[in-house]
Amino acid sequence: MEMAKEQELILVLDFGSQYNQLITRRIREMGVYSELHDHEISIEEIKRMNPKGIILSGGPNSVYEEGSFTIDPEIYNLGIPVLGICYGMQLTTKLLGGKVERANEREYGKATINAKSDELFFGLPSEQTVWMSHSDKVIEIPEGFEVIADSPSTNYAAIEDKKRRIYGVQFHPEVRHTEYGNDLLRNFVRRVCNCTGEWTMENFIEIEIEKIRQQVGNRKVLCAMSGGVDSSVVAVLLHKAIGEQLTCIFVDHGLLRKGEGDMVMEQFGEGFDMNIIRVNAQERFMSKLKGVSDPERKRKIIGNEFVYVFDDEAAKLTDVDFLAQGTLYTDVIESGTKTAQTIKSHHNVGGLPEDMEFELIEPINTLFKDEVRALGIELGIPEHLVWRQPFPGPGLGIRVLGEITEDKLEIVRESDAILREVIREEGLERDIWQYFTVLPGIQSVGVMGDYRTYDHTVGIRAVTSIDGMTSDFARIDWEVLQKISSRIVNEVDHVNRVVYDITSKPPSTIEWE
């Protein structure tokens, strides 16, 4: 990943903590660019990146375990401020000549520390609540260090070598449970590392446009557009950079939400004057899905067919050298570090053919999802599009459980439109992470008017979450749920029952298939 030289950087080294991405995000929220890299990064690479500061993350291991993660000690001699968090502090202590030993039992949870008012704790109260999570403990600090915080359980809750600007904390400042964690990180970033905090979406756009123009020159770029937030932001950013050199292919597989295909063409084709080729492939997809009920087979068919359709359309274009993708920074992190956890694959449509000879452009691969939304707003994309609901690549194909038919798709499409309309009317769009309807394939007895019915059940799924990795069902007001239910059974044909999914993730996933 190339960075503009004028951009301030805080480098976070990964030792396997579940909070690693939080550190990076907290720094970015301060207006300072931050990247997460593997702990095995070379000294030469660090020098090339020229960070203003380095943070060593926490991790689940002991510094004394065989094969435990370590770093080149030369990092401490670069003249760059270093902050070690939990495992990062223990490793710093060990590498610089102090002593660390295994604790009798793992310390996990809230604790109270007493801090001195130095650079790290500048302007903060001496007594603070912090979040501890460690199995080793420091029993002797290295030469040149002094204690700047203690707690009832340890004399070394935080340490510093003021001369070399090396710090360590035995708690997690990046988590919300640590009372003044953000303030501590801000002191490190601003006071110790002297960062100015000028990283904004506005200057990100300027830097990225210049990079795109340098990479592309006068050649052409192809972008697969789904109408989702990521591909839409990529397309608008590229169009702003290279104009008519960009061509977008929008594959309409017939599994979209109500009015979605027309919306893409109207908002982006006409609204942004972009060159978008719409491929109406509904019949092709439905014929391939006929009789298929297994969810994995459905996913593979939809993914593969998307690739074939895109490949066919791309072959009709000439002189295209680049393919643009909406890869996010979370994707880069999950695939780019040895300590990353394996996470269930997302529903996004599968990769494009390996034999397509394009050079990749991934202009948002340094951004998190919320930053992509902020970028979209800065680019002038209407707010209601930027804040659209996440939508899986296979679309409604995995919200109709079992075999997909046109009639079943229509039920999901109409009921989902009602759900989204009511949520919007009630002002709940920003409060709920994701919400949609599903067709479980269950029919039940009902009474409508004077007649007995035997019709479909519609399920409502609405969850709250921060990142989608875990979630809880949304506590929607009963009157709102009643309004949604009443409208669905009265306005959608062949539905006589509505149920609400009150399961968390885990054990369930957000999507039903």
From Swiss-Prot:
Residues 9-198 form the Glutamine amidotransferase type-1 domain. It catalyses: XMP + L-glutamine + ATP + H2O = GMP + L-glutamate + AMP + diphosphate + 2 H(+). The keyword Iron does not apply. GO terms for molecular function: ATP binding; GMP synthase activity. One of its GO terms (cellular component) is cytosol. The active site is at C86 (nucleophile), H172, E174. It is an enzyme of class 6 (ligase). Pathway: Purine metabolism; GMP biosynthesis; GMP from XMP (L-Gln route): step 1/1. Transmembrane segments: none annotated. ATP binds at S226, G227, G228, V229, D230, S231, S232. InterPro entries: Class_I_gatase-like, GATASE, GMP_synth_C, GMP_synth_GATase, GMP_synthase, GMPS_ATP_PPase_dom, Rossmann-like_a/b/a_fold. Residues 199-388 form the GMPS ATP-PPase domain. Catalyzes the synthesis of GMP from XMP. Homodimer. This is GMP synthase [glutamine-hydrolyzing].
